[in-house]
Amino acid sequence: MRTFKSLMISLCMGTTLCMCLPQTTTAQTVSSGDSWTWDKGTIVIDTPERPTGQKSVLGLTTPKMEVVRVGFVGLGMRGPGAVERFTYIPGTQIVALCDYEASRAEKCQDILKKASMPKAAIYSGEKGYEELCKRTDIDLVYIAADWLHHFPVAKCALENGKNVAIEVPSAMNLQECWDLINLSEKTRKHCMILENCCYDWFEMNTLNMAQQGVFGEVIRAQGAYIHNLSPFWDHYWKNGKEDKLGWRLDYNMKHRGDVYATHGLGPVAQALDIHRGDRITTLVAMDTKSVVGKDLVEKRTGEECKEFRNGDHTTTLLRTANGKVIEIQHNVMTPQPYNRLYQLTGSKGFANKYPVEGYALDAAQLTASGVQPKVDDLNSHGFLPQAEMEALVEKYQHPILKKYGEMAKEVGGHGGMDFIMDSRLVYCLQNGLPLDMDVYDLAEWCCLAELGAISMDNGCAAVAFPDFTRGEWNVTKGYKHAYASPEDENANMEKAKAFTAKLKEQGAKEWAKEAKKKKK
């Protein structure tokens, strides 16, 4: 038996780091050591047994919440947007705001004022989140902190009996994945990954098509995070004057693997029913050498960069128990258009989002899918003509988009998908339903960096993919979104709207009273 010193995973925050807390030794980014063995050329990592008294959280529900009381941790770049989105969701109350810098938390009070919501309690400092998590009037802790502190904040919240929603990546290594699984199973609280790309329009409509057999059996999928960050490297937070690289470039220099896999993997994993009738069994990763990365370091430091661990382009291949293949790519270095790929290959059809959105079906399959072709000799050698594509999308528009789509475009958040994600989270909590993404999704989507590093550091060897459900991946048949009955949904929404109306009345009075005091 050998022990591998594992690697960590980082978070892309777009252009700047959302610093909530300082980097400390308490925010571990590496597993303490994963035990593994070779088995017929495949690396097999030990799977910890489920502790006595715990049970699976597949399909986990919690009692209905008429009002979802929220505490936000991390108010740098992404956090304030989440606070604002929640002011548009009926039946929510923003109870507390936390950031390492008190000024950032205080600034978010302006968002509440604009929405006529009452002031929230403010927490700050390195351990401010611990006090927030101890409150008894919070149901959900929404974590948009820096990537080092996703896990410690989530751990604290779960240990204090709170449901948690965590920005991506939600866990930095295998140990953190297992710890979050154990905490969710032990506390019976939700632990959701905030993967917004699962709620983009093309992905949702295509998922609906796949679930209804439009593409036949989906046998292969691709996803990616390809985003040239050259304009942004100098905007990442730097730890003092001596730090010439910023956290992100320094991280990429020192660590290998797909460090931001969830945008690409999440949507295709849902389309392939991962841990809902199928599971990933094998991973193999390969990367290019670093050319751009090394050059970036040398230009900023004036010194030779002897090693840049993260390849300019990383490719990870995954095989499932049912013989499907997933390809995930990562590239933040080379000049090329933004691309998440999102491609599904089926036995009877094909879907592709980047760089060109389109569907490929022959006339017989399009007709069988309920859309009559308007052109003769339609085949699958090219994408559907515009009219046929629009008809297909209209027929298979996802019910969630029908419900939230227009409002999402008004509220915004990465084009609206953030608002849809938050709305679904609240909807499921208010109606006592399973969330759209569970803690096993979190683990499966976040572990690619460490597993990929293990593969590449051992000659691009195959790595047996852990079964995070511990044998229950085939219990649930097919990925599904949960819905309340129309009667319950309407009744709960009326209660939510009534609560929010009263809350806004209260908030307006409080802000008016404060304004009078300031005039005096």
Curated annotation (Swiss-Prot):
Superkingdom of the organism of origin: Bacteria
| Cofactor notes | Binds 1 NAD(+) per subunit. The NAD(+) cannot dissociate.
* Keyword hit for Zinc: no
- Secretion signal: which residues? 1-27
Positions of NAD(+) binding: 77-78, 99, 147-150, 167-168, 196, 260
Cofactor(s) essential for the protein: NAD(+)
Keyword Oxidoreductase assigned to the entry: answer is: no
GO MF entries: hydrolase activity, acting on glycosyl bonds; nucleotide binding
User: Keyword set for this entry?
Assistant: Glycosidase, Hydrolase, NAD, Signal
The residues listed in the UniProt record as binding substrate, with positions renumbered to this chain, are: 225, 248, 260-263, 338
- Enzyme Commission code: 3.2.1.-
Q: Which SUPFAM superfamilies match?
A: Glyceraldehyde-3-phosphate dehydrogenase-like, C-terminal domain, NAD(P)-binding Rossmann-fold domains
Role of this protein:
Glycosidase.
Q: Which family does it belong to?
A: Belongs to the Gfo/Idh/MocA family. Glycosyl hydrolase 109 subfamily.
- Official protein name in the record: Glycosyl hydrolase family 109 protein 5
Q: Which organism is it from?
A: Phocaeicola vulgatus (strain ATCC 8482 / DSM 1447 / JCM 5826 / CCUG 4940 / NBRC 14291 / NCTC 11154)
Q: Lineage of this protein's species? A: Bacteria, Pseudomonadati, Bacteroidota, Bacteroidia, Bacteroidales
